[in-house]
A protein has these predicted regions:
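Membrane-embedded alpha-helical bundles of multi-pass transporters/translocases
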Residues: 2-464
Length: 465
């Protein structure tokens, strides 16, 4: 029985474009914040890293809090759209704040300014916006194929934006003057673009009525729960924990790739190569995302596709290490592209896997926690990306790196090689292992068989709204 279709092509594109706004924040922050603070503002990389790590202490609470608030929201716009819309206003303001540290302030005041701006951006506004955006996957369609398509559209826009930001920002800042004020100008422009696109994206889709989302299900009057109960439901779901771990590893991987700006500048002696490597990463990802929905259908599920993709990614990153020590930039780019091609399918169907993960909680616990379940996306992005950036700062500080020096010691160059060549390979191996155990689709099929739920009723009745 063919599943009911809920979305037009323009709904899918409109939804996917929302990750332009998300990556205006995320790609800009993770790729350039550290180099801005160390080289333009003159702050110590190790101290910045520590402040970022301390900021992450707030994230675990705020992710679950906002996920729970989305689940409890009932408005004319729906559950998630208000949080997506209004959360981004704060994102735009605090993004500019992170890149507008007044150079006239004393050193301590500069650290305080950065910490407050960064914490508000990540722990409050980005959390509310990103969880709501991700939760829309479950709230605007019940069709599993459309969910995979939404994920593909979303990450095509995400990686295109990331590519563009990584490719043009260095030159853009130089054209604006190359100093701290230039970074502020670029941040303002990016924030305005993000605000406009986020608004268009939110208004391009419509959440399904709750009656339709819950059609065919028995209403549970005792389904109300607080943050503590929501947390307990999450940790009981082993697949949620796996996805959280995988998401964190992905963002750690991304932080090390972002640290490539140091590797290109000091090891390869050409900072403009950072933009060229961005093409090698993002174009193959986009190509893989285009074909992900077709491959999911061909292999009758996401598990095999994701696992095989990451086997290819591990091979690619291992060859990048070899090419790096050979000193061959063309080979490094080629193998970087190979690794990215393997990573693409998991990026494209991740939200659909989370929807299946949410379904697993319903089948095992009898509770629906759409918004709370999607907290893993925001939690993983912020903890992984934040800790990754912090680790970059600590490693640079440990190696003796000083941002405003004309030359760097060999220990700093060795550390840059380790961060850019070896750590991404290690993270890919760990992700591959996690994906080898993440067969939530089969787990759900077995549970439905035990409960006597017909296979063709899965999406309409038990697939997460």
């Amino acid at each position: 029985m063919e599943e009911k279709k809920y979305l037009k092509w323009y709904n899918k594109i409109g939804y996917g474009s929302g990750d332009i706004a998300g990556n205006v924040v995320y790609a800009f922050l993770t790729s350039f914040m550290m180099v801005y603070l160390t080289d333009s503002v003159g702050l110590a990389a190790g101290v910045v890293g520590t402040l970022i790590a301390v900021s992450k202490l707030f994230d675990g609470f705020t992710d679950i809090f906002f996920g729970s608030m989305i689940d409890k929201t009932h408005s004319k716009m729906g559950k998630a759209k208000p949080w997506m819309l209004y959360g981004y206003i704060g994102c735009a303001i605090t993004l500019v704040g992170c890149f507008a540290v007044p150079v006239s302030l004393g050193t301590t005041a500069k650290y305080v300014w950065f910490f407050i701006s960064y914490t508000l951006l990540n722990s409050v506004f980005y959390t509310a916006n990103n969880i709501a955006y991700s939760a829309l996957t479950s709230l605007i369609t019940k069709n599993s194929k459309e969910r995979v398509q939404m994920g593909s559209y979303r990450f095509i826009f995400a990686f295109s934006t990331s590519l563009l930001i990584q490719a043009i920002t260095v030159g853009f800042v130089d054209k604006c003057g190359g100093d701290a004020a230039a970074w502020r100008t670029v941040a303002i422009i990016y924030a305005i673009i993000g605000l406009v696109v986020n608004t268009i994206s939110a208004l391009s889709v419509k959440e399904l009525p709750e009656e339709e989302l819950n059609e065919g299900e028995v209403k549970n009057d005792n389904e109300k729960y607080g943050i503590v109960q929501a947390f307990k439901l999450l940790v009981k779901n082993k697949y949620y924990m796996m996805i959280c771990g995988t998401y964190i590893l992905q963002q750690l991987y991304g932080a090390m790739i972002g640290a490539g700006i140091y590797y290109m500048t000091w090891v390869l002696k050409n900072k403009n190569l950072f933009g060229q490597f961005a093409w090698a990463v993002n174009i193959p990802l986009i190509i893989a995302l285009i074909f992900t929905p077709t491959l999911v259908g061909k292999w009758k599920g996401m598990y095999k596709l994701n696992l095989r993709g990451y086997v290819l990614a591990v091979i690619g990153r291992a060859l990048v290490v070899v090419a790096g020590y050979m000193g061959s930039v063309p080979l490094m780019m080629a193998f970087t592209a190979l690794a990215a091609l393997g990573q693409g399918p998991w990026q494209g169907d991740m939200n659909a896997v989370i929807a299946s993960c949410s379904e697993y909680t319903y089948l095992t616990q009898g509770k629906r926690i759409d918004g709370t379940m999607y907290s893993c996306t925001s939690l993983g992005v912020k903890i992984g990306g934040g800790i990754g950036t912090a680790v970059v700062g600590w490693m640079l500080e440990l190696s003796g790196y000083v941002g405003k020096n004309a030359t760097q010691p060999q220990s700093a160059l060795n550390m840059m090689q380790f961060m850019y060549l070896w750590l991404p390979l290690i993270f890919d191996v760990l992700i591959m292992f996690a994906l080898s155990r993440m067969n939530v689709e089969d787990a759900n099929k077995k549970l439905k068989a035990e409960k006597g739920i017909a296979a063709d009723e899965v999406t309409d009745k038990s697939d997460m709204n």
